Amino acid sequence: MNLISIPALQDNYIWLLSNKANRCVIVDPGEASPVLNALDQNALLPEAILLTHHHNDHVGGVSEILNHYPNLPVFGPKETAKCGATYLVEEGNTVSLLNSEFSVIEVPGHTSGHIAYYNAPFLFCGDTLFSAGCGRIFEGTPKQMYESIQKIAELPDDTVVCCAHEYTLSNLRFSNDIWPEDPDIESYLHKISQIREKSQSSLPTTLGLERRINLFLRCHEIDLKRKISNEPENIENWQVFKMLRSKKDCF
């Protein structure tokens, strides 16, 4: 499989995953023109569109893409039914595309019906998990979002995490502010600062890396609990997550 990231809008990434037969899936097309250009430049024929949630920066290009490929199936959660989805999927479903299987994982929090797609080693997680961070909680609860991220954390270290936004640098600055003496965060902040100065992408990431530099995956660690709570022995992991997310919202 070959993975292509397509910069779109202000800081989005649309993902293309293709096989050796030059067929591909399009994930979260927030706008159409960069997708159509990428398909043309790489001589790819789309087999389907996969949607993770209903926000316009993830679905805004669907209708125009369908104008060019009118029979293209569009998979998504129930909340995307009005956004062009023709096949509604949920936890436990598998989608057969590219002679392969994409497992559907429900990850509510950012939106109430948010899903992710997993085709080892690739995880398309929309706005649930970011590099060094996680999505804002618009429709779900902090506990829901924590549990969704814990689902993702069960996947292998070599999972290729395909996030939908270029937020890595700001997330690392926040993490470094919370935990300035963490060597992994400090080192990766320096690396990503250099990458972004060259306008290069920081994505995709891997779950193994995120376990080290993403505080939202480290809410069980007592040292982190001491950073954000006066009663670290008595706070539950999801409450650590809630406090971290609240601090990030104000950062």
Swiss-Prot record:
It comes from the Bacteria. Zn(2+) 1 binds at H53, H55, H110, D127. HAMAP family: Glyoxalase_2. It is an enzyme of class 3 (hydrolase). Gene3D superfamilies: Ribonuclease Z/Hydroxyacylglutathione hydrolase-like. The gene is gloB. It catalyses: an S-(2-hydroxyacyl)glutathione + H2O = a 2-hydroxy carboxylate + glutathione + H(+). Transmembrane segments: none annotated. PANTHER family: HYDROXYACYLGLUTATHIONE HYDROLASE, HYDROXYACYLGLUTATHIONE HYDROLASE GLOB. NCBIfam families: GSH_gloB. This is Hydroxyacylglutathione hydrolase. Binds 2 Zn(2+) ions per subunit. Zn(2+) 2 binds at D57, H58, D127, H165. Its EC number is 3.1.2.6. Belongs to the metallo-beta-lactamase superfamily. Glyoxalase II family. Thiolesterase that catalyzes the hydrolysis of S-D-lactoyl-glutathione to form glutathione and D-lactic acid. Keywords: Hydrolase, Metal-binding, Zinc. InterPro entries: Clx_II_MBL, Glyoxalase_II_hydrolase, HAGH_C, Hydroxyacylglutathione_Hdrlase, Metallo-B-lactamas, RibonucZ/Hydroxyglut_hydro.
